[in-house]
Structure formats: structure tokens, C-alpha cells
């Protein structure tokens, strides 16, 4: 079985082909970051238009990369949500049109389930069950995972996601969008403990997150350290970035440890754009070593949005016999716990 996967939920156009016998045989990705940087964030209308321009050429490139033709494809899957409705509709419309033309099944895939399954593409994939930390620009969730489709949300952000907090704080520090990587680069040059940020919601029970207060704390710290010209010196910028990042990482570490203790699990899977953060990876690895557990995450190229994770996740569900009709429907808001459980039905 060979599955074509299409990802268009936000500002990356991803197309990939997953082969049941050979694994991932094609992976094409186009990022719109440069286009949106001028606006300081993703412009939904521009994102949709760019997906229209890029998706079909990327499909052609993916087929070429895999040395396949349309006749070799056994199913088409696409991101149906969550995400920007216009962007989702582009991928959905193209995917379903191709499925109809090629007379193969089509299926909408949950974007965050795709992220959750991304580590399965690695040579040493995690075994079930595990706790998953899904951490991106739009989501921060801790999920109890017992199998494909067996999900329980243990905790999530009640306001800004971690990636969103990085971008907003980066903007306050004068960094261009998207600012997450740039904040981390500044943080590497920061002086530890010059500034101490709070660790939100760690002084009470529970596994929910809150990151919006850190942005406010950063703004107040910046304003309190401006020189007579209203500017921050470079070292102070680095020190604030360091304090902010350490607060986010420490908060995540505390919540992950609680989730593992609550479930009794020894495996932690981390996925999503922020999972590429070096400090977070280092500190999580240290925590899991102390707990005598294991941490898994995808290679950096599969941390951000991509077609590979969608193709693989769709493959799992199509192989299980799950399909949907050819109506064009997307779900900008979609709870992962609503997904069918295929863990005990041969998937």
C-alpha cells in the first residue's frame, strides 16, 4: 500500500508518500515563513493562496522523487484539522479531487495525531503506552497514549501555547517572526539567574499550562531595563531570553514528570515544532535519565509541519479500513479524543 499525504494546515505545504514495504519514499516541503515574516505572523488569506500555488507542483515532485505514477497510489490522505480553515480547504479539495480521479480512498487526518505519530518514522520508534508532549505554535498538550486512537488529554494550555509565547516574547525583544529559534539563540548567550521568571501553574496540582503571563512578565522586565534611549543592551536581551526560555522549559519538565508519575509510564514522546528546542531536549533527557525512563522525538525536519507524518498516520488508518466519503469537510477545531480507536482492530 502506497499513500500520498498532504499537509496544508497553516504555513507549510507538505507532500509525502509512504510505502508499506519501503517506508517513506518521498518528502517534499515548502515553507511560507519568508512571506509571512513581513507581516509579523501568518496571514490566513495569503497562506491559502500560496497552498493553491504550491500543492500540485509538490505532488508532482513527490511522485518523481519516489519514481512512481498516479497509478501506483493506493490512497490519498490530508490534514483535515485543526488549522486555518482556508488552508485546510485547499488540501482537502485537492486530495479528494485526486482520490476521485484516481479511484482510490481518501481520508482526513488529525494534524496533532500526525505530530504524535512522527516519532514512529524513526529507526527506534516508541512502543505503546506512553505520555506524549505535543508542543507547537498552536498547541501544548500532555496526552496519555495507549494505542492509535486511544488518547486521553491529561493537560493543555489554558491560554497561549508554548510556541506562541516564544514568538510573542521574541517580538518584544525585537526579533523577526517566527521568533522561537532566535529567542533560543539569544538564550544560549544569556547569563543564568540574572532574571528569574515565574513557573506558571506549578505551585498547584494539575497538568494544565499557562504561558501568557510569561509574556507579560517579559514585557515588564524589558521596560524596567531600558536605557535612557529606550533600548535594551544586547547582553540584557540575551539574559531576558535565557530567563524566559528556562521558565518555559522548567514548567514543561515539572508537568511532564507529574504526568509520568500519574500514569506510571516510563516512556515520553515529544513532538511538534517546539520539540526541536535544544534546551528542552537536554533537560527532558536529563529528567528521563533520573526517572530511568526513555524519551523519544522525531528528527528536526519532522518536528515542524510536514507531509510525512500525515502520510504515515493516514496509512495506519486506511490500512485499518477507515475511509470517509468524498464530501469536502474540514475541522478547524477538532479534539483528538474524538478519533476512532484502531489499536485493537488490526491497525
UniProtKB/Swiss-Prot annotation:
UniProt xrefs under SUPFAM superfamilies: Actin-like ATPase domain
GO CC annotations on file: cytoplasm
Signal peptide: none
Single biological process term from Gene Ontology: tRNA threonylcarbamoyladenosine modification
Cofactor(s), by name: Fe(2+)
Catalytic activity: L-threonylcarbamoyladenylate + adenosine(37) in tRNA = N(6)-L-threonylcarbamoyladenosine(37) in tRNA + AMP + H(+)
Keyword hit for Transferase: yes
Keyword field: Acyltransferase, Cytoplasm, Iron, Metal-binding, Transferase, tRNA processing
GO molecular function: iron ion binding; N(6)-L-threonylcarbamoyladenine synthase activity
Entry keyword Cytoplasm: yes
Residues that bind Fe cation: 111, 115, 305
UniProt similarity note: Belongs to the KAE1 / TsaD family.
Function (record text): Required for the formation of a threonylcarbamoyl group on adenosine at position 37 (t(6)A37) in tRNAs that read codons beginning with adenine. Is involved in the transfer of the threonylcarbamoyl moiety of threonylcarbamoyl-AMP (TC-AMP) to the N6 group of A37, together with TsaE and TsaB. TsaD likely plays a direct catalytic role in this reaction.
Protein name (record): tRNA N6-adenosine threonylcarbamoyltransferase
Originating species: Actinobacillus pleuropneumoniae serotype 5b (strain L20)
Amino acid at each position: 500500500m502506497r499513500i500520498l499525504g498532504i499537509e496544508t494546515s497553516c504555513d507549510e505545504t507538505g507532500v509525502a508518500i509512504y510505502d508499506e514495504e519501503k517506508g517513506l519514499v518521498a518528502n517534499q516541503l515548502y515553507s511560507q515563513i519568508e512571506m509571512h515574516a513581513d507581516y509579523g505572523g501568518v496571514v490566513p488569506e495569503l497562506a491559502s493562496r500560496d497552498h493553491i500555488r504550491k500543492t500540485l507542483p509538490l505532488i508532482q515532485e513527490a511522485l518523481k522523487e519516489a519514481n512512481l505514477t498516479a497509478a501506483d497510489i493506493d490512497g490519498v490522505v490530508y490534514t483535515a484539522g485543526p488549522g486555518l480553515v482556508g488552508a485546510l480547504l485547499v488540501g482537502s479539495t485537492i486530495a479528494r479531487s485526486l482520490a476521485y480521479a484516481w479511484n482510490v480512498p481518501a481520508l482526513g487526518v488529525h494534524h496533532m495525531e500526525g505530530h504524535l505519530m512522527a516519532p514512529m518514522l524513526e529507526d527506534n520508534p516508541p512502543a505503546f503506552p506512553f505520555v506524549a508532549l505535543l508542543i507547537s505554535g498552536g498547541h501544548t498538550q500532555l496526552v496519555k497514549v495507549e494505542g492509535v486512537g486511544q488518547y486521553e488529554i491529561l493537560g493543555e494550555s489554558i491560554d497561549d501555547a508554548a510556541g506562541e509565547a516564544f514568538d510573542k516574547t521574541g517580538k518584544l525583544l525585537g526579533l523577526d517572526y517566527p521568533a522561537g529559534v532566535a529567542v533560543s539563540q539569544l538564550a544560549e548567550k544569556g547569563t543564568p539567574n540574572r532574571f528569574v521568571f515565574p513557573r506558571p501553574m506549578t505551585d498547584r496540582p494539575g497538568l494544565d499550562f499557562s504561558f501568557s503571563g510569561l509574556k507579560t512578565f517579559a514585557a515588564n522586565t524589558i521596560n524596567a531595563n531600558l536605557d535612557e534611549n529606550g533600548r535594551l543592551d544586547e547582553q540584557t536581551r540575551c539574559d531576558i531570553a535565557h530567563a524566559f526560555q528556562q521558565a518555559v522549559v522548567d514548567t514543561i519538565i515539572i508537568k511532564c514528570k507529574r504526568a509520568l508519575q500519574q500514569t506510571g509510564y516510563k516512556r515520553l514522546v515529544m513532538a511538534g515544532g517546539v520539540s526541536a528546542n535544544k534546551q528542552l531536549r537536554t533537560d527532558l533527557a536529563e529528567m528521563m535519565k533520573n526517572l530511568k525512563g526513555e524519551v523519544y522525538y522525531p528528527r528536526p525536519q519532522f518536528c515542524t509541519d510536514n507531509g510525512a507524518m500525515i502520510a504515515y498516520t493516514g496509512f495506519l488508518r486506511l490500512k485499518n479500513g477507515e475511509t470517509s466519503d468524498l464530501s469536502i469537510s474540514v475541522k478547524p477545531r477538532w479534539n483528538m479524543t474524538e478519533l476512532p480507536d484502531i489499536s485493537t482492530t488490526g491497525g
